[in-house]
From Swiss-Prot:
InterPro entries: Glutathione-S-Trfase_C-like, Glutathione-S-Trfase_C_sf, Glutathione_S-Trfase_N, GST_C, GST_C_Tau, Omega/Tau-like, Thioredoxin-like_sf. The keyword Transferase applies. The gene is MSR-1. The keyword DNA-binding does not apply. Induction: By auxin and cytokinin. Pfam families: GST_C (PF00043), GST_N (PF02798). It catalyses: RX + glutathione = an S-substituted glutathione + a halide anion + H(+). This is Probable glutathione S-transferase MSR-1.
Length: 219
């Protein structure tokens, strides 16, 4: 493992933090992980991200980098020698950024409505959720990974949300696998040891969701 002055402020259930753990693992970067309590944010978090006051934050040589896709690009640029995530071709790179942004703009907010919603709103959220993943299946096509033959930027941006699939399905009583078989095959291709070890067990995420629903009065 390469030794660097790298700190990751994170929360174990955060899909946005998981993608950074994956990237650092793939590139063999040694780092210090600091778990944040989102109900009682640390002085370090507030100092390092005074604008948004949220995780994840990568601190490299004392300097903070915020927003997960921005951090993901930073990691790829600084440690570009091993396991490059973004393509070298400018057009392909622009497409990878487009789909990563699509993932960020769509999945988290719709997924939250899936696990927290009720009645018609939840049913509508489920339909939107499946449509999002069918759109992603269309982009994946017959490729092994979104970028082709090698695991890349879009894969790392998306795969953390699979650890939430059990929670989505259990809370809303539906099957993602039944609706999106191609995505499940892709998910199985992501059983890279460095990827899987960077993701929490789905039941741990479900326990977190139940706790969150209780706090929000949704249980």
């Amino acid at each position: 493992m390469e030794s660097n002055n790298v700190v990751l402020l994170d929360f174990s259930g955060s899909s946005f933090g998981m993608r950074l753990r994956i990237a650092l693992a793939l590139k063999g970067i040694k780092y210090e992980a600091k778990e944040e309590n989102l109900s009682d944010k640390s002085p370090l978090l507030l100092e390092m991200n005074p604008v948004h006051k949220k995780i994840p934050i990568l601190i490299h040589n004392g300097k903070p980098i915020c927003e997960s896709l921005n951090i993901l690009e930073y990691i790829d640029e600084v440690w570009h020698e091993k396991c490059p995530l973004l393509p070298s071709d400018p057009y392909q790179r622009s497409q990878a950024r487009f789909w990563a942004n699509y993932i960020d703009n769509k999945i988290y907010s719709t997924g939250r409505r899936v696990w927290s919603g009720k009645g018609e709103d939840q049913e509508e959220a489920k339909k939107e959720f499946i449509e999002i993943f069918k759109t992603l299946e269309g982009e994946l096509g017959n490729k092994t990974y979104f970028g082709g033959d090698n695991l890349g930027f879009v894969d790392v941006a998306l795969v953390p949300f699979t650890s939430w699939f059990y929670s989505y399905e259990t809370c809303a009583n539906f099957s993602i696998e039944a609706e999106c078989r191609k995505l499940v095959v892709w998910q199985n291709c992501m059983e890279n040891e460095r990827v899987s070890k960077s993701l929490p067990h789905p039941h741990k995420i479900y326990d977190f969701v139940l706790e969150l629903k209780h706090k929000l009065g949704l249980a």
